[in-house]
């Protein structure tokens, strides 16, 4: 593997090998990360990257598209079958571009959109002021009830009635509960808005049938194809409305993108095929079991979990009672081979660059084959680290760092990731 890279560019080869080692021997708990199969990785690294294919299958602006047409057609048909959609666009380069395409297809610059506040669990592209969505459109953010820390649907309705948005966005990047899509659609219909659901985080759960399918209520659904779907980095747009599908297609190309990434689209097709298996369904069930178990273990150790738990693949830990910042916790854990990300919590008092919480997700460790027993062990190790942080920079007592680093390595060796499947690389 990578023998040609080693010959041509030793510096990048070093990057590849060291990143492989980091993934192989570290505990990945960032909720938006996962480990793609070698089938997906091989497809992304194929000669399909050489092919320009502006347009759509059978309607290209270039010749020689016979086989990339086939790849995209497979991706489209599999996406439609997987999620029960009548129309699918597999060309978005990312979830952000999928969201941008929907906004520009259904609204005009200056129109009002509603999305969950970033500080309450939303995403940058749902209207954050620093993002294109917050610059192009008038944004009315909604949030969670500060008592229950779940979406305040009455407040969503009140804001919608007051501001009459063109689009209401449901979904988030740090929201652990199942969203009431039916309630959102009722609110959207009441004010004549489109309902767009961004299911980037929980698409894998939807594909496995263990999470409500937003297509039952949404006018249009966007997603990424990595995260819980465990595919290549990319975007996806689904709808059952032919007019919306036509508008979205025109907005993706020629609106905001040129040539599609055919090597990634083919890898999406592989990902969708993998997601149709019974093995994938069992995997997703275990992802949720693991998240629930780990959240419970944190609660046993005196940590406060935002909203009291989780229904999905992730949860937020409020570190305020432990007198440690999210930034310090992230640094401390990383020094021991455990990766999480600092995250704001509802009613946050600190800067998002410091934050009062950490976000934890179980998709990646579950891909390795870990189950509830390992979640208990991981929670115990995290608690040990966070109980021995000596300063605001996340410095951990040396003896604790050494102990936990050793335990992390041993745990990862019990659940190999890629090292028993690839040849020619010593890790």
From Swiss-Prot:
Alphabetically, the GO molecular function entries are:
glycine hydroxymethyltransferase activity; pyridoxal phosphate binding
**Alphabetic keyword roster:** Amino-acid biosynthesis, Cytoplasm, One-carbon metabolism, Pyridoxal phosphate, Transferase
Q: Which cofactor does it need?
A: pyridoxal 5'-phosphate
Q: Where are the residues marked Plays an important role in substrate specificity as a site?
A: 226
Name the source's superkingdom: Bacteria
Query: Which family is this sequence assigned to?
Result: Belongs to the SHMT family.
The protein's name: Serine hydroxymethyltransferase
Which species is the source of this protein?
Thermotoga petrophila (strain ATCC BAA-488 / DSM 13995 / JCM 10881 / RKU-1)
């Amino acid at each position: 593997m990578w023998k040609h890279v080693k010959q041509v560019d030793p510096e990048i080869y070093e990057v590849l090998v060291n990143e492989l080692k980091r993934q192989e021997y570290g505990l990945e708990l960032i909720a938006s990360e996962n480990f793609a199969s070698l089938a997906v990785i091989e497809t992304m690294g194929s000669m399909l990257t050489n092919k320009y294919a502006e347009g759509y299958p059978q309607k290209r602006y270039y010749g020689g598209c016979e086989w990339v047409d086939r790849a995209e057609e497979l991706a489209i048909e599999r996406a439609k079958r997987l999620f029960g959609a009548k129309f699918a666009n597999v060309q978005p380069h990312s979830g952000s571009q999928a969201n941008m395409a929907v906004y520009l297809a259904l609204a005009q610059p200056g129109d009002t959109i509603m999305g969950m506040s970033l500080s309450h669990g939303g995403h940058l592209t749902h209207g954050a002021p620093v993002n294109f969505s917050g610059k192009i459109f008038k944004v009315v953010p909604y949030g969670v009830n500060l008592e229950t820390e779940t979406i305040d649907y009455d407040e969503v309705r009140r804001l919608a009635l007051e501001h009459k948005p063109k689009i209401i966005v449901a979904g988030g990047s740090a929201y652990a509960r199942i969203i009431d899509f039916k309630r959102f659609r009722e609110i959207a219909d009441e004010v004549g808005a489109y309902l767009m659901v961004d299911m980037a985080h929980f698409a894998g759960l939807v594909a496995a049938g263990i999470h409500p399918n937003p297509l039952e209520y949404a006018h249009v659904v966007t997603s990424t194809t990595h995260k819980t779907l465990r595919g290549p980095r990319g975007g996806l747009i689904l709808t059952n409305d032919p007019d919306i599908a036509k508008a979205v297609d025109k907005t993706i190309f020629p609106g905001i993108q040129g040539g599609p990434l055919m090597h990634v689209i083919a890898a999406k097709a592989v990902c969708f095929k993998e997601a149709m298996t019974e093995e994938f369904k069992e995997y997703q069930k275990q992802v949720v079991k693991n998240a629930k178990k780990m959240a419970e273990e944190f609660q046993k150790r005196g940590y406060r979990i935002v909203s009291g738990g989780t229904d999905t693949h992730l949860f937020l830990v409020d570190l305020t009672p432990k007198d440690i910042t999210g930034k310090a916790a992230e640094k401390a854990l990383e020094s021991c081979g455990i990766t999480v990300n600092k995250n704001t919590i509802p009613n946050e008092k600190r800067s998002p660059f410091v934050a009062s919480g950490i976000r934890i997700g179980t998709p990646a460790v579950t891909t390795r084959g870990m189950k509830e027993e390992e979640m208990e062990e991981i929670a115990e190790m995290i608690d040990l680290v966070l109980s021995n942080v000596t300063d605001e920079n996340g410095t951990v007592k040396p003896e604790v760092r050494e102990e936990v680093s050793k335990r992390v390595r041993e745990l990862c060796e019990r659940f190999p990731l890629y090292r028993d499947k690839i040849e020619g690389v010593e890790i």
